[in-house]
Design a protein with these regions (language model features):
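Short Pro/Gly-enriched coil loops immediately N-terminal to beta-strands
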Residues: 1, 9, 13-17, 89-97
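Short, well-ordered alpha-helical scaffold segment located
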Residues: 2-4, 74
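Secondary-structure junction motif
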Residues: 5-7, 13, 20-41, 108-112, ...
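Residues that scaffold the ATP/ADP-binding catalytic core of kinase and kinase-like folds
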Residues: 6-8, 77-78, 87, 122
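Active-site-adjacent beta-strand anchor residues
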Residues: 23-24, 50, 68, 101
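Short beta->alpha junction loops/turns
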Residues: 26-27, 50-54, 91, 105
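Hydrophobic hinge/microswitch elements
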Residues: 30-86
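A late-sequence structural motif
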Residues: 87-122
Length: 122
């Protein structure tokens, strides 16, 4: 495993500038959130790959093509079986908060209900 040497230690965000970072495409709110957080701390990364989905980021990471930022739930099975691991930083990125707005007079689609249920799970 190419990045095994990073396992178990704590990194500074600045160290990301020297790693092959993989990100979601630039138009996503998640990408903007992470970039803004890093920029506030003086860290600017140039992604090796910009991919459309978290699933793609996970698959590239499994193949040791770089390090990626994804919601841990999406990578849970890969983390549990040891194919991936979570990088530890000297300061954690704060969790994001979401607000859900719905119309009580209009039923939610099946996809909206699934997202709603997912976001409500603690």
């Amino acid at each position: 495993k190419k990045f095994e040497y990073l396992k178990g230690g704590k990194l500074s965000y600045k160290e990301l500038e020297n790693l092959p970072v993989m990100c979601l495409e630039g138009s996503t709110s998640t990408r903007k959130y992470v970039e803004d957080y890093l920029a506030e701390r003086g860290t600017f990364v140039r992604p090796e790959f910009e991919l459309a989905t978290s699933d793609m980021l996970i698959q590239f990471a499994v193949r040791n093509l770089g390090v990626a930022s994804v919601v841990s739930d999406f990578a849970e099975k890969y983390i549990e079986n040891g194919e991936l691991f979570i990088l530890k930083f000297d300061k954690a990125i704060p969790e994001r908060e979401f607000c859900i707005v719905s119309n009580e007079r209009a039923p939610m689609s099946a996809a909206a209900e699934k997202l709603y249920d997912f976001l409500l799970v603690p």
